[in-house]
């Protein structure tokens, strides 16, 4: 028997979700930007999904943006933030154990002249908050730490990290990749 150990990243679709997706793909497939009936129906599905996600995160619907997935979201967040804040500094902090969707755009930014600091982790995969405190400086524009590691499941102390970052440099933007945490770890964007 095959043991599937990547359930947090890719989970089998529930029957209920599958049935709804088949209905949408076969019957309610209108362009949600169109004004005709099928488009309006498709838009309603999107609004309902946005509302449900916002409720789980205690966020406002306008704060929820849909992309094709985590990689696109992380690329937009990291590259966009770094390039938009380049005049404020060129230092970015991350960890040694980030997902490729974080590591790859940071490698690109390094090639563009940004200085990247990678925090080490202990034997359990946790960062040192003291090392983070020492790393944040006046030129630090961005810190990116995943909330739950996709390979070993380590839960990082992101709420504590947020406090340290804001204490050391209130202008530093804190990016948290919470893809693995959604639905399993209790958090909201307000707790960061």
Each predicted region: which residue ranges?
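Conserved N-terminal alpha-helix of the aminotransferase class I/II PLP-enzyme fold
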Residues: 33-72, 76
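Conserved PLP-anchoring active-site segment centered on the Schiff-base-forming lysine
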Residues: 81-103, 115, 120
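Conserved small/polar residues in nucleotide/adenosyl-binding loops
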Residues: 188-192
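Short acidic capping loops at alpha-helix termini that bridge into adjacent secondary structure
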Residues: 60-64, 88-90, 138-139, 171
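Alpha-helical structural signal in soluble globular domains
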Residues: 20, 24, 45, 52, ...
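Active-site phosphate-binding strand-loop segment of PLP-dependent enzymes
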Residues: 117, 121-181
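N-terminal "arm"/small-domain region of PLP-dependent enzymes with the aminotransferase-like
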Residues: 1-34
